[in-house]
Amino acid sequence: GLAPSIMNGSDALITDDSAFSAKFYVATSQLMAVNLGDHISGVFWAAFLLFSWTAASIVSGAVIERITTFAFGILAIAIGSVFWTIDAAWGWHFDGWMLKLLGYHDAYASGVIHAIAGGFALGILVVLGPRIGKFTSSGEPRNIGPRNPWLVTIGLFLIYTGFWGFYAACNIPIFNLGPEYGMEGVTYFTATNIYVTPTTLSGITFNFLMSLSGGLLAGYVVSRGDPFWTYSSGLAGVICASAGNDLYHPIQSMIIGMIGVVIAYRMHYWVERKFKIDDAVGAVAVHGYAGFVGLVICGFVLNGYPSSGYSVGAMWDGSTYASINPLG
């Protein structure tokens, strides 16, 4: 329950400085228990729990073979229950100060989950050091490939499917917009995302597939057909484009996914050689580097768009929000 408690709107522990906000998160409050007036909180609670698991699982891949279960459990609680939720409260809610003041935009979690978890993993790797045998006596890195390429393939295709499910879950349907939107007496269907901007399931699916395709293509080229990096790059392409995939043109999604993969791949091996960082499954590259690059690209490509569209009575006018910009 900590994740929704931290990032749930203007009454959240992080986004609200009121001393009375804590009353909403005691065990007897409506937000923390089932009640007849609750239609969606349980769904979001489960979703935020899943995101917490995701953040912890990203870290787990990077640190394999060098950490005890107890130590990893502590780190999983830190990243899964605290750090990513603070960032989400600030930049992944339409009432967050990063949206209103800085023009931050991250529709499908390039930064609030992937870049944060990748950066967290990088910090741990600096402390842990490399696996035994990863580097030669002269300091040259050895390539320790996956034990079973078939399991790598199956696992990454399952991740693709789950990621698309996350996209679809973020596409929240709205029926009968009501008189406040000038739709009185009219049953009108639309959908929105976490920033309350209009989206369609077909649009975000197309962008998802285009960024996935761009990532796979770029990964195949830069890795010269290496199966591990080809499939991992498909995920990196989606992560890179996810920050703005609610507003990108499909061709933009594909190109941005390709750019993110090239940068993540090159950065992985440069950091490995320069700083002797042993990122076992490429988690820092695929999630951290690609996610951060995606945020920067989003600021340039969507420069001038409202960071969020929520405005009662006007729907998507963005009048109370800073525009998306490269520095946001």
Task: Name each model-derived stretch.
Residues 1-328:
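Glycine- and aromatic-enriched membrane alpha-helices
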